[in-house]
């Protein structure tokens, strides 16, 4: 899937720190989810970095730490500071610096915020940033990001028993694939992706509720017939 003709030429970048990567992810996310408060103040940006939901890993950083990271990102032109407000506000410049379209920015943002994801998880979790028609369109953009001269994502080894490969961003440097292969192997053949695990839990609850309903029905019918279903059967 080719980028549009007016996509800016990408620049070579140094590896980012985890906090710098988190800041970029938060700025893109909030640009789409709370546009009325974007660009973000330092307070809002710090709160977004420390958010407990939709974050992996969860961070606990101070405004001073965020300010230091912002200064570095401004030097890389990845973040710009607005001057039209008494309160300093910050916005990202990822599209222009990285030279990638908004669809790819959406996918990269989810990886920056949530860690490794399958293409299916990326499609689901990026819905508020961009609506992808299907998983194949997600994979097409991921393949482009992985094929760049300076790759931005990588496909991780498939975990035993998993149906899909996960993807991870490379904004913080290269990934030791052996670490992921050994970690995945340690999960065993019974390991499943988070999305499948949640579906299995929901199905287990549904079945448990159904069993409880049927048990109540049996008890009611037995009571009407005068049968003691709890009595032990005759030994013969």
UniProtKB/Swiss-Prot annotation:
InterPro entries assigned: DUF480, WH-like_DNA-bd_sf, WH_DNA-bd_sf
Superkingdom of the organism of origin: Bacteria
Pfam (any one): DUF480
Annotated family: Belongs to the UPF0502 family.
PANTHER family in UniProt: UPF0502 PROTEIN YCEH
Protein's name in the database: UPF0502 protein Bcenmc03_4618
Protein species of origin: Burkholderia orbicola (strain MC0-3)
């Amino acid at each position: 899937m080719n980028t549009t003709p007016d996509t800016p030429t990408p620049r070579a970048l140094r590896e980012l720190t985890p906090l710098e990567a988190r800041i970029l992810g938060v700025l893109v996310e909030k640009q789409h989810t709370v546009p009325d408060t974007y660009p973000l103040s330092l307070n809002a940006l710090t709160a977004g970095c420390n958010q407990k939901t939709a974050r992996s890993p969860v961070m606990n950083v101070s405004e001073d730490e965020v300010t230091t990271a912002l200064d570095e990102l401004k030097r890389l032109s990845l973040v710009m500071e607005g001057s039209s407000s008494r309160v300093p506000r910050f916005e990202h410049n990822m599209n222009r610096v990285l030279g990638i379209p908004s669809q790819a920015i959406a996918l990269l943002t989810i990886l920056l915020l949530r860690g490794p994801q399958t293409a299916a998880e990326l499609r689901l979790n990026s819905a508020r940033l961009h609506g992808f028609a299907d998983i194949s369109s997600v994979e097409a953009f991921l393949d482009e990001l992985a094929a760049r001269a300076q790759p931005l994502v990588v496909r991780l080894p498939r975990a035993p028993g998993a149906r899909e490969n996960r993807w991870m961003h490379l904004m913080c440097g290269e990934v030791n694939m052996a670490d992921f292969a050994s970690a995945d192997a340690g999960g065993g053949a019974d390991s499943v992706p988070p999305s499948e695990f949640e579906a299995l839990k929901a199905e287990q609850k549904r079945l448990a509720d159904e069993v409880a309903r049927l048990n109540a029905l049996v008890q009611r019918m037995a009571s009407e017939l005068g049968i003691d279903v709890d009595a032990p059967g005759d030994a013969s």
